[in-house]
């Protein structure tokens, strides 16, 4: 999604892609917007300048590095790209949960100061996407209303915000520190709550009818919503304890999950009466299936959890 939107909105950008599977990528990526909040913008296509598994070939000379991979892979990626980072580069990720700032400081070490690097992170991914054909096209489902960004050094956060606003054409709001992101998980509490809520009584063997599987978000039930709420309540309790001990600590982004989702998807939610209904009626959460796999590849009608 990032390649398609950045390339489409900024056609003069040169976009290089570091991938373990470079042969799977086409010369460009198309993002289809039908059914999303961005439908009136039409489809977006971004051109890829270069795709390789060689970090030196991809990263050398880059002014902005955006890491778009799961949290547990970021440390190894940072270590891989470190020798090839350019003086003054911005090095960041599209979502900061998982302690990205600590990973970056550990992996990049003295190079942050010696190369005048800026570390940054968005609080949330700019949009939810669903792959159609890997490396070729995707569906954009849920674009965010605003982006929130933190940086190290902190005094560069306004500059980073301006860069990311230019990249995504979504307003980027400065955030006072990475702890706002570490303690503001989204999928890390939404997915466990949803999966447990739906599968808690499953025997781990009996397959499901593929045609009867609910959608991951828009068919969220009361049990799943309650589990997600319990997890979020723990996050709010941690915030309360931290602020009580450190009164000057600024954690404005750590707000209840229902308020957070309504802010992220402003204008896309038709019923805000409960957490369940927020999920059910959010067009930004629509059309996302459960991660299921067929029991038999020849017969996709029976599925189990991936």
Identify the function of each model-found stretch.
Residues 171-306:
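C-terminal substrate-binding/catalytic lobe of Rossmann-fold NAD(P)-dependent dehydrogenases
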């Amino acid at each position: 999604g990032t390649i398609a939107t950045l390339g489409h909105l900024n056609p003069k950008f040169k976009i290089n892609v570091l991938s373990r599977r470079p042969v799977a990528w086409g010369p460009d990526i198309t993002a289809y917007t039908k059914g999303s909040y961005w439908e009136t913008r039409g489809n977006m296509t971004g051109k890829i300048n270069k795709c390789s598994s060689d970090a030196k070939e991809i990263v050398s000379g880059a002014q902005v590095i955006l890491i778009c991979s799961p949290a547990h892979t970021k440390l190894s990626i940072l270590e891989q790209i470190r020798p090839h980072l350019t003086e003054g580069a911005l090095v960041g990720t599209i979502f900061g949960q998982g302690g990205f700032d600590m990973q970056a400081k550990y992996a990049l070490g003295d190079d942050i100061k010696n190369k005048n690097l800026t570390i940054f992170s968005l609080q949330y991914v700019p949009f939810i996407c669903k792959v159609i054909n890997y490396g070729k096209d995707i569906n954009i489902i849920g674009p965010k209303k605003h982006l929130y960004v933190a940086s190290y050094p902190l005094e560069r956060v306004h500059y980073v915000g301006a860069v990311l606003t230019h990249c995504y054409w979504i307003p980027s709001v400065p955030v006072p520190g990475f702890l706002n992101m570490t303690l503001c998980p989204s999928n890390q509490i939404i997915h466990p709550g949803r999966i447990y809520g739906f599968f808690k009584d499953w025997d781990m063997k009996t397959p499901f009818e593929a045609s009867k599987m609910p959608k991951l978000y828009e068919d969220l039930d009361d049990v799943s919503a309650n589990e997600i709420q319990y997890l979020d309540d723990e996050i709010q309790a941690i915030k309360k304890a931290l602020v009580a001990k450190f009164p000057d600590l600024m954690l404005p982004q750590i707000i209840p999950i229902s308020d957070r989702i309504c802010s992220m998807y402003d204008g896309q939610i038709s019923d805000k009466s409960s957490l369940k209904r927020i999920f059910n009626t959010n067009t930004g959460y629509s059309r996302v299936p459960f991660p299921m796999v067929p029991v038999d590849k020849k017969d996709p009608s029976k599925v189990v959890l991936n």
